[in-house]
Structure formats: structure tokens, C-alpha cells
């Protein structure tokens, strides 16, 4: 009799706060180069090309602080640009904070697997403009739920958001939560999140910020106990003020997803979108 379960699948994950394509080399850059957050600069497009080459090696990518097309990005939707360059067919962005024509602050999903459902949620907080993308692969009790988010800077706001997240995922068996959570692995709010949402932190203390001399972990990929983590690392690419965090997981046997092979980036020639100066 043929085996109905071909075995557990591997899934390559990446979470990256890309700071709208701007690199930062020291703390003083936040002040002296703050103008770059308002206007288009050629270095942003160069950085995006470098970021896209990183993304090409993964099956599911969660992005934070990506611009969905505004003045500062030269009216380039960075999500679609990165997806085209890295060969992702399934793309979705969630704009949470729009400042006129200047910026469209967004979370984003890039996936090689077709989602069965995508839901946008607004996160609670004293200051509006935070959200979470909920992406479902499969159906029923054995569906995989992937959450992409960028949490608040303040502890009080984060605790409110954690309560929301715990209520959101409490009935799910297989969860991957990724993003810039703005808190360390040993923080009170992380302990509350792991306990209330029944998630695991596979690599506590994996420093991702600041990218030029990382000394704290603000970026995380958390998983349900049903998901086996095989490898996790912070990648040493300084295209942002955060480092990307990469993880390879093995899914439970009952969860079978149509995961295609990644395209060969060496044969891909991206269309470089024009940059308004």
C-alpha cells in the first residue's frame, strides 16, 4: 500500500526589518542622515538589490519597515520590486502607517507557496500604525498559520499587542510568528508571549540589532512545539539597521505544502524601476 504521508517537509524562513532600504553604520546616522527617510536616494535601490539576493534563498519571507510606494522610495513599491527580483510569485503588503505622499510603512509577505487565506489585523496600541499579517496555508486543524508583525516601542503597548496575539492564535496547532518584536528574549513581555501563545523561542540571545555591532535581539522567529527547528542564524548583511534572521524548520508530517524549488538567481535580470530624484 502506498504511503499517504511522504514525510515531513523542510521550510526556509527569513524575517527582515529592512528600514525601507536604508543602511545605517552608527547611531549618529539616525540624526545626520535622517533626511534620507523623507526623500529618494540612489543608495536605497542598490541596497534593495542586495536584499533581494538574500531573499532568493528562502521559501517564506516576512518583511518589516518596507515601503509600499511613496516619495521616499521614488514611488517604487519595494515589496513588488523585491518579489520580482527574488522570484516570488505570491506577494502581499499591509500598509499600517501612511504619511501623505512621503512614506507607506508596511509589513509584507513574500512566498513561494500559494496562501489559502490572508487576513490583515490592526494591533492595539497608544499610537496607531501597527499591524499583523496572518497568512494561512492549508485548511482545518492542520493548517499552518504564519504571522508577520512589527510590535510597539513601548512595553505597555507591546503587552497589549501580546494579549491580542495570544487570543488570535490560541486555537491554532501550527504557528510561525516572525518580525521585529522590539523586545529581548529575556524580557518580561517575551515570557508572557511565549506562555500565553504557546510558542517556542528556538534561539534566545541571537543578536540582530544594531546591524553594525549587534548586542541585542529584537527580531525573532517563534514557532509552535509541533514545528522542528533545524537551523537558525542571524545573517551578517548590513543593508539595514537590523540583521535578517533565517531559520530552517521541519513541518509535522500531517502538514504537506506545495513547496516549489527556488529559481536560479544567476539567470534572473530584474527590471530596475526608475528612481525619481
Specify the residue positions occupied by each region the protein language model found.
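N-terminal, active-site-proximal structural segment of metallo-dependent hydrolase catalytic domains
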Residues: 1-85, 98-100, 253-277
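Short, solvent-exposed loop/turn segments at secondary-structure junctions
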Residues: 18-21, 68, 98-99, 113-116, ...
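Surface-exposed cleft-lining segments at the edges of enzyme active sites
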Residues: 34-40, 66-69, 119-123, 147-155
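Active site of divalent-metal-dependent phosphoester/diester hydrolases
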Residues: 70-75, 89-109, 128, 182-246
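Charged helix-capping and loop-helix junction motifs
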Residues: 75-80, 160-166
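Membrane-proximal envelope and lipid/glycan-remodeling enzymes
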Residues: 87-90, 147-149, 193, 233, ...
Amino acid at each position: 500500500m502506498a504511503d499517504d504521508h511522504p514525510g515531513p517537509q523542510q521550510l526556509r524562513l527569513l524575517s527582515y526589518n529592512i528600514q525601507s532600504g536604508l543602511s545605517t553604520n552608527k547611531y549618529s546616522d539616525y540624526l545626520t542622515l535622517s533626511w534620507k527617510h523623507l526623500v529618494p536616494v540612489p543608495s536605497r535601490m542598490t541596497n534593495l538589490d542586495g536584499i533581494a539576493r538574500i531573499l532568493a534563498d528562502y521559501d517564506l519571507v516576512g518583511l518589516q519597515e518596507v515601503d509600499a510606494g511613496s516619495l521616499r522610495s521614488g514611488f517604487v513599491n519595494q515589496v513588488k520590486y523585491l518579489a520580482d527580483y527574488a522570484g516570488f510569485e505570491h506577494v502581499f503588503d499591509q500598509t499600517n502607517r501612511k504619511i501623505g505622499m512621503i512614506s507607506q510603512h508596511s509589513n509584507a509577505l513574500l512566498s513561494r507557496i500559494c496562501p489559502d487565506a490572508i487576513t490583515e489585523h490592526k494591533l492595539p496600541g497608544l499610537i496607531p500604525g501597527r499591524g499583523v499579517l496572518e497568512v494561512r496555508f492549508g485548511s482545518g486543524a492542520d493548517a499552518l498559520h504564519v504571522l508577520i508583525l512589527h510590535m510597539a516601542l513601548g512595553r505597555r503597548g507591546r503587552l497589549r499587542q501580546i494579549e491580542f496575539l495570544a487570543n488570535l492564535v490560541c486555537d491554532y496547532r501550527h504557528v510561525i510568528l516572525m518580525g521585529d518584536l522590539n523586545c529581548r528574549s529575556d524580557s518580561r513581555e517575551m515570557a508572557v508571549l511565549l506562555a500565553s501563545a504557546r510558542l517556542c523561542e528556538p534561539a534566545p540571545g541571537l543578536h540582530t540589532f544594531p546591524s553594525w555591532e549587534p548586542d541585542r535581539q529584537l527580531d525573532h522567529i517563534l514557532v509552535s512545539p509541533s514545528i522542528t527547528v533545524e537551523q537558525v542564524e542571524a545573517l551578517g548583511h548590513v543593508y539595514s539597521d537590523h540583521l535578517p534572521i533565517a531559520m530552517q524548520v521541519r513541518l509535522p508530517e500531517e502538514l504537506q505544502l506545495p513547496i516549489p524549488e527556488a529559481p536560479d538567481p544567476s539567470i534572473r535580470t530584474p527590471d530596475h524601476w526608475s528612481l525619481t530624484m
